[in-house]
Regions:
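A short helix/loop element that forms part of the nucleotide-sugar donor recognition site in Leloir-type
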Residues: 66-70
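Short, well-ordered coil loops that connect the C-terminus of an alpha-helix to the N-terminus
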Residues: 3, 31, 65, 75, ...
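AMP-binding/adenylate-forming catalytic core of the ANL superfamily
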Residues: 33, 39, 55, 60-61, ...
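A short acidic, often aromatic-flanked loop/helix-cap motif at beta-alpha or helix-coil junctions
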Residues: 6, 183-184
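A short acidic/small-residue loop/turn micro-motif
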Residues: 26, 50, 101, 197-200
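Conserved ATP-binding loop and adjacent catalytic segment of the adenylate-forming AMP-binding
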Residues: 1-32, 44-49, 58-60, 74-76, ...
């Protein structure tokens, strides 16, 4: 795992397959990596937070953009990747999503990938992506877009009931749209934030009053 701002990988799995852990981009590679909360305080193993990196391969800042530079570094000079994740007891990191894609419902942080994983487990679902939409009561509510497998069919009600059993009411999508395809970038990654346009705000009458 690497990003432009580090000019090199920050996490990598060992070459020995026996030391690799499935689903993890690996352990720190030539730098220091930590998980931190919203205030920049380090979190212990097993706790989800932002992946932050520090080391000689990290950029000094964005060219002629001091504002972006200040926003991207903590006061103790850790670069904020914007990726969310956690570290296990063996020191391996796991990525769970992006900070800007986090759903904040009623003050609770909900990773959209948690909803994605449940939807992907449905036998009729080919692709799925959860997003945050404005809500008058909670601030943000959960919505999701789904593409079904060829030859398969499923209703919105069936998908919502499937989620409620596995996630409970609070974390289940209030709205689901069935689409023919999901928008993707050049690398094939789903452009999650583009999906928001498919949903009107929840409780729009209340929100405008």
């Amino acid at each position: 795992m690497g990003i432009t701002e580090t000019a090199a990988p920050i996490l990598s799995n060992p070459l020995d397959p026996a030391q690799q852990q499935m689903g993890s981009p690996g352990i720190p590679w030539g730098n220091d990596v930590r998980i931190a909360n919203e205030l920049g305080a380090p979190l212990s193993t097993g706790h989800e937070g932002e992946i932050q990196v520090q080391g000689p391969n990290v950029m000094k800042g964005y060219f002629k953009n001091e504002t972006a530079t200040q926003e991207s570094f903590t006061t103790d000079n850790w670069y904020r990747t914007g990726d969310l994740g956690w570290m296990n007891d063996d020191g391996y990191f796991f990525v769970t999503g992006r900070r800007k894609e986090l759903i904040i419902k009623g003050g609770e942080n909900i990773s959209p990938r948690e909803i994605d994983d449940v939807l992907y487990s449905h036998p009729a679902v080919l692709e799925a992506a959860a997003v945050a939409v404005p809500d008058a009561h909670y601030g943000q509510e959960i919505a999701a877009c789904v593409v079904t497998k060829p030859g398969e069919s499923v209703t919105v009600d069936e998908l919502q009931a499937f989620c409620v059993v596995r996630l409970g009411d609070y974390k289940s999508p209030a709205k689901i749209q069935l689409l023919e395809e999901l928008p993707k970038g050049p690398s094939g990654k789903i452009q999650r934030l583009q999906l928001v346009q498919h949903f009107a705000p929840i409780n729009p009458t209340t929100m405008s009053s």
